[in-house]
From Swiss-Prot:
Transmembrane in keyword set: yes
Full protein name: Betaine/ectoine transporter LcoP
Induction: Expression depends on the external osmolality. Induced upon hyperosmotic conditions, resulting in an increase of its transport activity.
Biased composition (Polar residues): 1-13
Any one cellular-component term (Gene Ontology): plasma membrane
Activity regulation, free text: Uptake is activated by hyperosmotic stress. Shows a small but significant chill stimulation around 15 degrees Celsius.
Gene that produces this protein: lcoP
Region (Disordered): 1-28, 611-630
UniProt topology in membrane: Multi-pass membrane protein
Its biological purpose: Involved in the uptake of osmoprotectants. Can transport betaine and ectoine. Na(+) is probably the coupling ion.
Family of the protein in this entry: Belongs to the BCCT transporter (TC 2.A.15) family.
Record keywords, A-Z: Amino-acid transport, Cell membrane, Ion transport, Membrane, Sodium, Sodium transport, Stress response, Symport, Transmembrane, Transmembrane helix, Transport
Length: 630
């Protein structure tokens, strides 16, 4: 069918043979398919689980038995990686932002992350709150006061002099660069690709599923399993780094409250063990709702602590600093993104300690955060999803870092003890609160918040890894979930041990090494995502509409001058709206052929939602799945 100027086909012309489509539905008319409406058969992927588990257990055993050996090898590999592949980390962060901005403002922006009928499950406020909760953690406390202070005292190479008004704004811009759009652009890329793949294309929720447009059925073979194994390993190390930071920060709080002279690695390991017990209890006892409530309380306490510092700290100074730091961040963004080996050895050292670690950390967190964001974003348009996911959480974190960092820098300017650069990063937080009201209470609140972040992060990340090792099962076996949680704790311990006296060094080095290969996965994912969108039913309709109107207007002017109107009727072969588009190609139609649990084709009526063999989905409560578990 085509839109033309109104000319009928010659009576002598035979109609072309009707094309055959799955379920007699043109690819431009498919309303979308949700993974929930598919007849998937889940089970433990023994290859993904077995190989990944063996590698991780071997690494943990090596790290515990010979931490010096791990430290030596990782340091050597780290030096090589920073010299030769540091540019890759910068590049992938820009890819995330660029891809999502392109999608948001292109013709793909109107495509839904779901079927045509799907509406958002959550209000916009609740959606943003949950999204923000997924992307923040202990880092806002560990680095919030200390990072801006550090950059203020020792600015990045080739920028400004330290302890000056210029370094104040440079310090906050650098912190915003690390925690703002770059991180959330990458989360949006992975979350958007997963949500589209699962709720628009009906694929199982696996990282490998997002590559279907490029690799076809190979995503269900060795190539797909390799991608999922890399995603699990990245998540393990990224979350383990977070757990290690939590332990370090909690240890500092325990030291302050107890009056202990020093917190050793043995004490940090004991803290990890205690918090691990809390994670295991939450995983196996069915208190998931309680954990969610606790997580919501934690977010409220976090924002409350930020507001507390804003009110009791240098409020007027902070009000002036917020817009200044945001504008400085915007003006310096490309300059900061362009720093690499070409700027010299000092820049490489700065990148290794700060920027590269953050990029690696965010890359390693993308499977975890991306999968969570995907699950709560169903029914949103890609334009709304991309813009809000990148902008709102970034702005909230920018506010938090400006308030914490601006307060710490103010205390340095006022010569308050502990803010001259001599204190450790974990100590600066407690030093800041010690100079504000209610210090008899705030250390306990901070320890509680940090501990809950530990448990909830471990719990959520373990479920994600359980899903990835169970063929996309959204409710994986609890023993698998606990196993991955214990592996995270083991890696966190190894990271602390390999860091020696500076535990943070071990966390940073290993996180960067693991993230570099997964960065390549994310670049290819961006390409696959765009290719997927190019054959979306909505994109096909837009293509036909553009061709039909263009053809009809030209033909109308040629044959009727000013006096013509558009109508819909059969067009001559080769002159229709779809003349240059093969709507029957396998890569256009294969995805919406419905199958049963064994993968056999089954007819389906998209209008009525009925299967030809009479199958109907069982009525299940939230969190349950119609699946066969190993």
């Amino acid at each position: 069918m085509s839109t033309n100027s109104g000319n009928n086909l010659p009576e002598s012309q035979e109609s072309p043979e009707e094309p055959h489509y799955p379920h007699d539905t043109h690819p431009g008319l498919v309303p979308g398919i949700s993974v929930d409406a598919q007849r998937n058969k889940f089970g433990l992927d023994k290859t993904v689980f077995g190989v990944t588990a063996a590698l991780i257990l071997a690494f943990i055993a090596w790290g515990i038995s010979s931490p010096d050996s791990v430290s030596s090898v990782s340091s050597t590999m780290f030096s090589w990686a920073m010299t030769n592949t540091g540019w890759l980390l910068n590049f992938v962060m820009l890819i995330g932002i660029g891809t999502m901005l392109y999608i948001a403002f292109s013709r793909y922006g109107r495509i839904k992350l779901g079927t045509d009928e799907d509406e958002p499950e959550f209000s916009r406020f609740s959606w943003i709150a949950m999204m923000f909760g997924a992307g923040i953690g202990v880092g806002i406390f560990f680095f919030g006061p200390s990072e801006p202070l550090w950059h203020y005292l020792s600015p990045p190479p080739h920028t400004v002099e330290g302890s000056t008004p210029e370094s104040l704004h440079q310090a906050l811009a650098q912190s915003h660069f690390h925690w703002g759009l770059s991180a959330w652009g990458l989360y949006a890329l992975v979350g958007g690709a997963l949500a589209y793949s699962s709720y628009r294309r009906g694929r199982v929720t696996l990282i490998s599923s997002t590559f279907r447009s490029l690799f076809g059925e190979k995503t269900e073979g060795i190539a797909g399993r390799l991608i999922d194994m890399m995603a699990i390993i990245a998540t393990l190390f990224g979350t383990a780094a977070t757990l290690g930071l939590s332990a370090i920060q909690v240890g500092q709080g325990v030291q302050i409250i107890s009056g202990a002279s020093e917190i050793t690695n043995n004490i940090l390991i004991a803290i990890i063990a205690i918090l691990t017990i809390g994670f295991i209890i939450s995983s196996v006892s069915g208190v998931s709702k309680g954990i969610r409530y606790l997580s919501n309380l934690n977010i409220s306490l976090t924002l409350g602590l930020v507001l507390f510092v804003f009110i009791t700290g240098p409020t007027l100074f902070l009000l002036n600093l917020i817009p200044s730091s945001v504008l400085e961040y915007g003006s310096e963004f490309l300059s900061m993104a362009g720093k690499s080996l070409s700027w010299g050895e000092e820049t490489i050292e700065f990148q290794a300690g700060w920027t590269a670690f953050y990029w690696a950390w965010w890359i390693a967190w993308t499977p975890f955060v991306g999968m969570f964001i995907a699950r709560i974003s169903r029914g949103r348009t890609l334009r709304e999803f991309a813009l809000i996911t990148m902008a709102i959480p970034s702005f909230i974190l920018i506010l938090a870092f400006t308030i914490f960092g601006g307060t710490a820098i103010t205390m340095n300017r006022e010569n308050v003890d502990g803010f001259d650069g001599s204190s450790s990063k974990e100590q600066v937080l407690f030093d800041m609160f010690s100079n504000l009201p209610l210090y008899s209470i705030t250390p306990f609140i901070l320890i509680f918040v940090l501990a809950v972040f530990f448990v909830t992060s471990a719990d959520s990340a373990s479920v994600v890894m359980g899903t990835m090792s169970s063929q996309g099962n959204p409710a994986p076996n609890k023993l698998i979930v606990v196993f991955w949680g214990l592996c995270m704790m083991g890696i966190a311990v190894v990271m602390l041990l390999t860091g020696g006296e500076s535990a943070l060094t071990g966390l940073q080095n290993l996180t960067i090494l693991i993230a570099i290969p997964f960065a390549l996965v994310l670049i290819v994912m961006a390409i696959a995502f765009i290719k997927d969108l190019s054959t979306d039913p909505a994109a096909i309709r837009q293509r036909y509409a553009k061709a039909a109107i263009s053809n009809a207007v030209v033909r109308g002017l040629e044959e009727h001058g000013d006096d013509f109107e558009l109508s819909i009727e059969p067009a001559e072969e080769g002159r229709g709206a779809g003349a240059t588009f093969d709507s029957t190609a396998d890569h256009i139609t294969d995805w919406y052929q419905r199958t049963d649990e064994e993968g056999n084709d089954v007819d389906y009526d998209f209008t009525t939602g009925k299967w030809a063999d009479g199958w109907t989905p069982e009525s299940t409560e939230e969190g349950e799945v119609d699946a066969k578990k190993d």
